[in-house]
Amino acid sequence: MSRSDHASGQMSTYRFPDELRVDELLLRGPIESDIETIAPAFRDPAVGGEASLPPVDADTLHVMLREQLPGMRAQGLLAAYVIEDLQQDELLGGASLHHFDPLRDVVEVGYWLFVSARGRGVATRSVQRLTEHATANGILRVEAHVRVGNTASERVLERLGFEREGVKRKYLRHGNDRVDATLFALLADDT
C-alpha cells in the first residue's frame, strides 16, 4: 500500500512476514521443538519480566503455538518470531509484530533476549529488520512499549531512531503487577 492509498482512505493490507534474515540471524515462526528452549524465558524474571512475557509453562506454550498463534496471525493481531543464530544453531530470544491497525497503518514491535544473548546487537538488528520490513510495506508508524526503567530496551529503540512520546500508566504487566510503560514510535518518514 502506498502513502497515497493511505491518504485516500483505503485500509492497509500489510501482511506479517513469515521470516526475515539479518546477518547470521533468522527471525522465524516458533515450532514445537523450540518450546523447551524458550519456555524458561517466560518464567525467568531477568528475561520475561523485562519483556512483560506472561509467566506460562511449556504445556501452555504448546497450546498457544497450535491453537492461538495461527488465528492471531491471520487476524493481524500477532506475528511471533524466535530469533535464531544460524551460525551457532542457537535460539537467542524472540520478537513480535502485533496490534496491527489497518486504519492507521500502525504496528507494534516487541522483543526479548536470553541473558546470554544480550550486548551483541541482536535486539537492535532484529528490531531494525522488522521495522524496515513494516515501513517498506505500507506501515506509517511502528510503536514499542517499554517498562519504565528498562534502560537496555530504551537504548535499543533510541539507537534505531525511535522517539520517546510519553508514558502510559499501568500499561504493562511485570510479574503480578501493572507497571508504567514508555511509548516509543518511529515513523516511516524517519527511516
Language model regions located:
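Conserved phosphate-binding and hydrolysis motifs of nucleotide-dependent enzymes
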Residues: G93, N150, G161
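Structural signature of beta-strand start/N-cap positions in the alpha/beta core
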Residues: L26, L140-R141
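GNAT-family acyltransferases
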Residues: M1-S116, H133, R178-T191
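Positions that flank functional sites
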Residues: D57, G149, L172
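Conserved active-site tyrosine of GNAT-family acetyltransferases
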Residues: L157, F162, F184
